[in-house]
């Protein structure tokens, strides 16, 4: 059975639906747990991760802030939580955190704006105008964040496998549709798709470990894994190559390391 991600905008019952689907499949349901796991493992304050996930960046943040450490830490944490494949993730990053994996069913919950306004109004006791403003602001913030982190737009239907109009069905009906879709042959794990997942999990775990190290944080590194063989390349601070390689070798699952690292002396930018 596939890993399932469920995305919904600022309204509705995405979490409740995810929990119902997970119960029906015997899966575990995760959402905020990804933030907690990433914070615990990779030394990123949970409040900062929550800010990164929930709030859209201003234009100057997009220029000045490197979002890689947060993206990679969240990816590594989700891979860790989804290691057994029996996961339903609810949130607005999951469908982008597991790219290229055939046994992931990506679900988008949508509805007309009037339906969403009614849901937010009743859930948060807001007037219609306030509910509309809330939805618009949250949607814009999440759109900016996804574009900044992944270069993608959540409104692109091609990013998802299944799109459900929640104004047309109850939670029970949506649950049945998702569970039946999860049984389709196209979304079942294969040896190839499981290898892609394992490579992504190991590569992101190594990358997150490097970015969490104070001695490596300023480096510009690319990391990928293939069957336990980890490839690391990029610019590092002068004299830090041994530290980088030791960090990589100590990550569980790493069998072999190939590096292509270079450093630039501090005075190289100032001339004679």
Model-derived features with residue positions:
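A short beta-strand-loop structural module common to alpha/beta enzyme folds
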Residues: 28-36
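N-terminal targeting leaders
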Residues: 100, 111, 118-119, 148, ...
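Conserved phosphate-donor/acceptor-positioning beta-strand/loop module used by diverse small-molecule
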Residues: 102-122, 135
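ATP-dependent small-molecule kinase phosphotransfer cores
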Residues: 35-89, 126
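Short, polar loop motifs at secondary-structure junctions
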Residues: 91-95
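Glycine-rich phosphate-binding P-loop
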Residues: 5-19
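Surface-exposed, low-hydrophobicity interaction/linker segments
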Residues: 123, 128-142, 193-201
């Amino acid at each position: 059975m596939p890993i399932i991600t469920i995305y919904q905008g600022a309204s509705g019952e995405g979490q409740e639906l995810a929990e119902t689907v997970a119960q029906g499949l015997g899966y575990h349901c995760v959402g905020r747990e990804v933030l907690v796991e990433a914070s615990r493992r990779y030394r990123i304050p949970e409040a900062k991760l929550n800010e990164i996930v929930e709030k859209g960046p201003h234009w100057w943040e997009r220029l000045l802030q490197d979002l890689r450490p947060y993206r990679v830490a969240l990816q590594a944490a989700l891979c860790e939580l989804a290691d057994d494949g029996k996961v339903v993730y609810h949130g607005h990053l999951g469908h982008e955190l597991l790219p290229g994996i055939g046994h992931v069913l990506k679900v988008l919950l949508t509805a007309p704006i009037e339906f969403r306004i009614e849901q937010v109004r009743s859930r948060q006791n807001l007037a219609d105008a306030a509910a509309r403003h809330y939805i618009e602001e949250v949607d814009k913030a999440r759109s900016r964040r996804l574009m900044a982190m992944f270069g993608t737009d959540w409104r692109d239907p091609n990013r998802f496998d299944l799109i459900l109009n929640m104004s047309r069905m109850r939670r029970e009906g949506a649950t049945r549709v998702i569970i039946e879709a999860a049984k389709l042959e196209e979304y079942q794990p294969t040896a190839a798709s499981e290898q892609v997942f394992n490579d992504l999990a190991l590569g992101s775990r190594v990358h997150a470990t490097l970015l969490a190290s104070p001695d490596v944080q300023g480096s510009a590194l690319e990391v990928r894994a293939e069957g336990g063989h980890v490839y690391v390349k990029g610019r590092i601070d002068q004299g830090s190559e041994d530290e980088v390689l030791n960090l990589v070798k100590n990550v569980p699952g790493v069998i072999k390391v190939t590096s292509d690292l270079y450093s630039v002396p501090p005075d190289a930018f100032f001339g004679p």
